[in-house]
From Swiss-Prot:
Residues 188-384 form the Histidine kinase domain. Member of the two-component regulatory system DegS/DegU, which plays an important role in the transition growth phase. Acts as both a protein kinase that undergoes autophosphorylation and subsequently transfers the phosphate to DegU, and a protein phosphatase that dephosphorylates phospho-DegU. The modification Phosphohistidine is found at residue 194. Its main location: cytoplasm. This is Signal transduction histidine-protein kinase/phosphatase DegS. The lineage of its organism: Bacteria, Bacillati, Bacillota, Bacilli, Bacillales. It comes from the Bacteria.
Amino acid sequence: MPFKGLVVQVADPQTLDKIIDKTLDTVGKSREQIFEISEQSRNEYVSLEQELQEVRMKVAEIIDQSDRAEVHARFARNRLAEVSKQFHRYSNEEIRKVYEQANELQVKLALLQQEEQQLRDRRDAIERRLLNLKDTIERAEELVGQMTVVYNFLTGDLRQVGEALEDAREKQAFGLQIIQAQEEERRKLSREIHDGPAQMMANVLLRSELVERIYHDKGIDEALKEIRDLRKMVKSSLAEVRRIIYDLRRMALDDLGLIPTLKKYVKTFEEHTGIFVDFKHIGKGERFPEHVEIALFRLVQEALQNTRKHAKASHVHVKIEEQKTKFTVVIKDNGKGFDQTEKKEGSFGLVGMKERVNMLKGQLVIRTKPNDGTTIIISIPITTEE
């Protein structure tokens, strides 16, 4: 039975905008606070890494001193035992000197061992703190990314509250997917920079501060050797930065098309990595929808980068075959392979590849086992529409 006189009040768009603005302010402030925690943790991480390097050097020095002190103390004890057995052959003054020397060396050895234990304890404490900081940084970055997704989304289509509900839902789902994909790409790029050039430059900074100490302690030859090592690290860091920049570009995909662009990329990949790539193309090399060409290029790129980072392979075979209704891509390496039931370091890249293939309504099959290489088979329908 209908309820007569029942009135449902709907908030006007201005009221909803005020609510969204208040929510945005709260989300924005929370995001900044988490970012500050992340930065503070990162700064402490760098500082502790430097201290850990110094403590490890001191431990090595103390161990060396302890070993030498142990030899001297043992010699002094043997000398004291010899004098004690034949004390009638030595004067009281000689016996006293031998005893004092043995006692002094034993005390010195005990102090060195105590200092070594303290340094080891400090080293272990720093390593534990670094693990906790790393976990804090990763969690903070993930939270910032999630809040950014929410923030960007709230400043987007949700303000258009006057549109039809179904249309809004579709835009919401699509917009959220795009924002999530963007944030995932940013997190991936952030990880690559942090684990690659940023880590290398942090090591360069730490080691550069040791050059002066090495010069004073070990002389100019050792200092010059350290500088040469630093130069190699800087070159490696520069090469890694160039690789990241190179991977971010689609190169001449729009102008050349998929196959010529892949050939160019494969050649550059070989030059940068020393891994031989046997590239084979079967088909006419026609142009296809942009989103299909971009996806195939990124899939091959991601597969080769996974090979470079994790497979320890020397040869890779890449075959692309154009058929009437689909593209088939096969990437096979002679690397170490892996157990698919175990979560591996490179699984993130494979997950991204699977998601990209699913978006194109394709199929991805991985065949691998430990010590037997990896084969990736990708099938993409040519008729896929944007």
